[in-house]
C-alpha cells in the first residue's frame, strides 16, 4: 500500500511548479528548455527504495516507468495550460482526406524500421548492410528489467516528442506552410540529440553515440509523422517500446545501446536508417496526406477545423 501511495505522490510531484513556471511561458524556445529541465527532474525516482522482494514494483520504480507516466500526466496539464488540446490522443474523425491505405503504409514502414534496427547484422561486406539479419532472442533476457527498461523510453520519450511537436506547431503557427515540417523534423532532431548522454553507457563509445544520434532520427521522423497522421500517441509508443524490447531480448537491457566499427557498412546502415524514413515523411507532405497532418495539427492547437466527412 505504501508503494502505491508513494507512486501517487510522485505522479503529481512537479505538477504545481510546472504549471506555475513552465505553463506561463509564451516563447516556444523557452518552452522547449522548460520541458527539457522538467525531464531531468524525473531521474531521482530511480533512487526511491523499493525492496527487490517486490520485483515488479522495484523494477517499475527503479527503471523510471513511474517517472514516464508522471511526465505524461504533466504533458496533459501543460498542454491545457498553453491552450492546446489536453489529451495527446485525438478522437478519430474520418475526414474526406483521411485514407486507411496511407495509415497502413505508414504502419508497414514503421514496422520495417523496427525490424531493420532490431535485427540487422552486417559485417564488412557491403551486401550485409541490406540483407543480413539475425534474430537472436534469448530466454535469459526475458526479465522484468528488460520489459520495464523498454517501457520507460516508449512512454517518456514519446511524451517528450508530443510536447516538442505542440510547442513547435504553436511557435510557428503564423507560417502554416512550414509549421508541420518544422514540428516533425524538429522533434526528430531533438529526439536524436537526447541520446548524446548515452556516451560511455556500458562501454558505448563516443563514435557509436554520434552514430546513434543520427540513426535514431530516422525512427523519429516516422514516429512523428505517424502520430500527426493518426492522432494517436499510443501508436508510436508501442513501436518505440517494441524496438527497445527486441534489442533487450538479444543483448540485455544494460548493454551498450549502439555499436560502430568504422566500416563502410556502418555508414551505409546509417544512411538507410535515416534516408528511407526521410523519404516517407517528404512523401507525406503532399496531397491529401498533408491535409490530414494539417487538420490534426489544428486540432492539437484547439483551432477550428472544418471536416468534409463521408
Task: Give the positions of each predicted feature.
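Juxtamembrane helix-loop-helix connectors linking adjacent transmembrane helices
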Residues: 35-36, 43-68, 73-159, 164-174, ...
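N-terminal, membrane-interfacial amphipathic/helix-forming hydrophobic leader that caps
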Residues: 1-92, 245-310
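Transmembrane helix-loop-helix hairpins at the membrane interface
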Residues: 143-310
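Membrane-water interface of alpha-helical transmembrane segments
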Residues: 28, 96, 100, 178-181, ...
Amino acid at each position: 500500500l505504501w508503494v502505491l501511495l508513494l507512486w501517487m505522490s510522485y505522479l503529481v510531484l512537479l505538477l504545481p511548479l510546472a504549471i506555475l513556471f513552465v505553463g506561463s511561458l509564451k516563447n516556444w524556445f523557452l518552452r522547449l528548455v522548460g520541458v527539457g529541465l522538467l525531464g531531468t527532474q524525473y531521474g531521482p525516482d530511480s533512487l526511491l527504495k523499493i525492496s527487490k522482494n517486490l520485483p515488479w514494483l522495484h523494477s517499475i520504480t527503479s527503471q523510471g516507468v513511474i517517472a514516464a507516466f508522471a511526465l505524461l500526466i504533466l504533458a496533459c496539464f501543460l498542454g491545457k495550460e498553453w491552450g492546446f488540446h489536453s489529451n495527446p490522443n485525438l478522437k478519430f474523425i474520418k475526414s474526406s482526406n483521411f485514407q486507411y491505405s496511407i495509415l497502413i503504409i505508414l504502419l508497414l514502414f514503421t514496422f520495417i524500421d523496427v525490424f531493420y534496427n532490431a535485427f540487422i547484422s552486417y559485417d564488412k561486406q557491403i551486401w550485409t548492410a541490406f540483407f543480413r539479419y539475425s534474430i537472436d532472442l534469448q530466454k535469459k533476457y526475458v526479465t522484468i528489467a528488460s520489459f520495464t527498461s523498454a517501457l520507460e523510453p516508449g512512454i517518456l520519450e514519446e511524451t517528450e516528442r508530443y510536447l516538442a511537436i505542440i510547442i513547435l506547431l504553436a511557435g510557428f503557427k503564423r507560417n502554416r506552410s512550414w509549421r508541420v515540417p518544422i514540428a516533425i523534423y524538429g522533434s526528430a532532431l531533438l529526439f536524436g540529440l537526447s541520446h548524446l548522454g548515452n556516451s560511455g553507457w556500458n562501454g558505448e563509445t563516443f563514435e557509436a553515440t554520434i552514430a546513434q544520434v543520427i540513426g535514431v532520427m530516422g525512427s523519429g521522423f516516422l514516429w512523428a509523422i505517424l502520430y500527426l497522421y493518426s492522432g494517436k500517441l499510443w501508436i508510436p509508443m508501442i513501436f518505440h517500446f517494441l524496438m527497445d524490447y527486441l534489442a533487450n531480448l538479444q543483448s540485455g537491457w544494460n548493454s551498450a545501446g549502439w555499436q560502430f566499427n568504422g566500416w563502410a557498412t556502418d555508414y551505409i546502415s546509417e544512411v538507410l536508417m535515416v534516408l528511407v524514413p526521410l523519404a516517407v515523411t517528404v512523401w507525406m507532405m503532399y496531397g491529401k496526406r498533408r491535409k490530414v497532418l494539417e487538420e490534426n495539427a489544428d486540432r492539437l492547437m484547439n483551432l477550428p477545423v472544418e471536416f468534409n466527412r463521408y
